[in-house]
């Protein structure tokens, strides 16, 4: 990545800065990290902007490896029809949303999409169960019993389901998140 052909143009950098919450330095670092995942023959700027990286490769990044929602994060940000890879722009979008400077509304919108495992626009009991299992782990010693899970989900819905339809929609989720001062600072990935 040392040659002059391996740097993003000033125009492209400016465009990415306008479209994301990232600084010029963060964009350059993101490009370098993305290119490290590409085969050497695809590391030119032109190739890197048109080559997709598999989830397997993206998930090898230390910043994502330990995240319990790593697969969902990749799926939500992938523009691939098969949702199995990320382009550089997908990768930038991901990093932008998880940056310190992204707005709480943007962060909560994407958190909702990540937690909506069945992509139906609501968090139902199954989504909430999967969310809890991701957070607690699915090992014998950490997994909640069926009655504990039911009680926890009942409590979550009691607190969050304002319209009492048995699910949490985006506005209900954002209302709950707005009362959580640590959410925005904990919803981040730093390269």
From Swiss-Prot:
It comes from Rattus norvegicus (Rat). Calcium-binding protein that plays a role in the regulation of numerous cellular processes, such as cell differentiation, cell division, cell proliferation, cell migration, thrombosis, angiogenesis, cardiac hypertrophy and apoptosis. Involved in bone marrow megakaryocyte differentiation by negatively regulating thrombopoietin-mediated signaling pathway. Participates in the endomitotic cell cycle of megakaryocyte, a form of mitosis in which both karyokinesis and cytokinesis are interrupted. A lipid is attached at residue 2 (N-myristoyl glycine). Ca(2+) 1 binds at residues 116, 118, 120, 122, 127. SUPFAM superfamilies: EF-hand. It holds the Pfam family EF-hand_7. Keywords: Angiogenesis, Apoptosis, Calcium, Cell adhesion, Cell cycle, Cell division, Cell membrane, Cell projection, Cytoplasm, Cytoskeleton, Differentiation, Lipoprotein, Magnesium, Membrane, Metal-binding, Myristate, Nucleus, Repeat, Spermatogenesis. Monomer. Interacts with the heterodimeric integrin alpha-IIb/beta3 (ITGA2B-ITGB3). Interacts with ITGA2B (via cytoplasmic domain); the interaction is direct and calcium-dependent. Interacts with the protein kinases PLK2/SNK and PRKDC (via the region immediately upstream of the kinase domain). Interacts with PLK3; the interaction inhibits PLK3 kinase activity. Interacts with PSEN2. Interacts (via C-terminus) with F8. Interacts with NBR1 (via C-terminus). Interacts with FEZ1 (via C-terminus). This is Calcium and integrin-binding protein 1. The EF-hands may also bind magnesium ions in the presence of high Mg(2+) levels and low Ca(2+) levels.
